[in-house]
């Protein structure tokens, strides 16, 4: 298959290096995923995870054709509306949609396969979401956000203090890395296909903490939800999940992972703005700070983090637009 720019329509991409195009022939359409950079992850691994999801009865894009040497694959088209688009405009019954999302999440978490074959007939082993990888992600906050807020002298002091705090939080995570984690499980990566929730953007999947994807869904920086809605989703997950869960450990990990994830996101959005000139992501940073505040406010485990953030990141910095 050849990729003809004249026969495809560019569509809005995401925060990755990929480009997306819609190909239309008569009444049929498909999506071209183009990736020159990180093509193993963005093409090979992406399709491998999709095939695994499909085998486990989770709706995901099917591979229609591939031309890896030319940096693209062709996949099934799920349309233009994500669950983000639906929830953003929906006034009633939002919780009903979230309940369906949680059913999909639990199906994902029941996946146990760790080695899969890609379309090049080579095996791909799904990595472990180790604490060193989590720490590497949190460091994006230090690498990309802090340098644009503080001068070099102050930055060194803040880096040193805050890195100790985030490292100590990682040591307080209790649950094992034995659960399939999408790693970007939020409503912008979920679509409806014939009333069935479909999962996209799965190339970064790992085996990690069972609280991670729930934290990603509930404390989603792209979509504001009330504190009450967040708690309802959290309790519904506990109700639906038939596994024996240590509630105290789970809550502990949920809140730590949410905070660390949103620090990472602040770093990623700063990188997108300053390196890639995608300034639109900056407007989401104040809400990421709100989500961090929500989790650290009433939990003693964040005592040192709260003290550090209040001393170094006053509201005029956090909520600067």
What is each stretch, according to the model?
Residues 1, 113, 121, 125, ...:
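An alpha-helical support segment within catalytic cores of ATP-dependent transferases
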Residues 139-149, 210-245, 259-276, 288-296:
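Active-site activation/catalytic loop segments of kinase-like enzymes and analogous catalytic loops
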Residues 267-321:
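ATP/Mg2+ or Mg2+-diphosphate-binding catalytic cores
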Residues 26, 69, 75-90, 123, ...:
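A glycine-centered beta->alpha junction motif in the catalytic cores
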Residues 21-136, 174-175:
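ATP-binding pocket architecture of kinase catalytic cores
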Residues 17-24, 32, 108-109, 166-214, ...:
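Active-site acidic catalytic loop and adjacent metal/ATP-binding pocket
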Residues 1-6, 54-58, 244-245:
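Short secondary-structure junctions
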Residues 3-24:
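ATP-binding glycine-rich phosphate-binding loop
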């Amino acid at each position: 298959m050849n990729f003809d720019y004249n026969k495809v329509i560019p569509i809005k991409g995401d925060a990755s290096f990929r480009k997306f195009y819609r190909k239309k022939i008569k009444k049929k359409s498909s999506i071209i995923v183009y990736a020159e950079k990180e093509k193993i992850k963005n093409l090979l691994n992406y399709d491998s995870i999709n095939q695994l999801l499909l085998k486990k009865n989770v709706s995901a894009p099917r591979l229609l054709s591939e031309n890896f040497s030319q940096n693209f694959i062709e996949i099934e088209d799920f349309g233009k509306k994500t669950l983000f688009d639906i929830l953003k405009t929906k006034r009633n019954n939002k919780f009903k949609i979230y309940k369906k999302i949680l059913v999909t999440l639990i199906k994902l978490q029941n996946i146990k396969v760790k080695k899969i074959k890609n379309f090049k007939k080579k095996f791909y082993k799904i990595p472990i979401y180790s604490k060193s990888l989590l720490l590497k992600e949190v460091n994006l906050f230090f690498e990309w956000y802090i340098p644009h807020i503080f001068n070099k002298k102050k930055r060194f002091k803040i880096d040193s203090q805050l890195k100790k705090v985030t490292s100590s939080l990682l040591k307080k995570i209790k649950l094992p890395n034995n659960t399939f984690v999408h790693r970007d499980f939020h409503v912008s990566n979920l679509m409806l296909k014939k009333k069935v929730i479909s999962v996209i953007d799965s190339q970064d999947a790992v085996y990690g903490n069972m609280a991670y994807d729930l934290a990603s869904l509930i404390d989603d920086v792209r979509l504001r939800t009330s504190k009450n809605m967040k708690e309802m989703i959290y309790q519904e997950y506990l109700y639906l999940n038939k596994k024996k869960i240590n509630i105290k450990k789970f809550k502990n990990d949920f809140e730590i992972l949410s905070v660390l994830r949103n620090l990472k996101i602040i770093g990623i959005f700063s990188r997108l703005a300053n390196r890639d000139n995608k300034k639109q992501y900056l407007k989401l940073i104040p809400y990421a700070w709100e989500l961090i505040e929500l989790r650290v406010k009433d939990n003693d485990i964040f005592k040192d983090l709260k003290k550090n953030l209040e001393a170094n990141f006053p509201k005029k910095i956090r909520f600067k637009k």
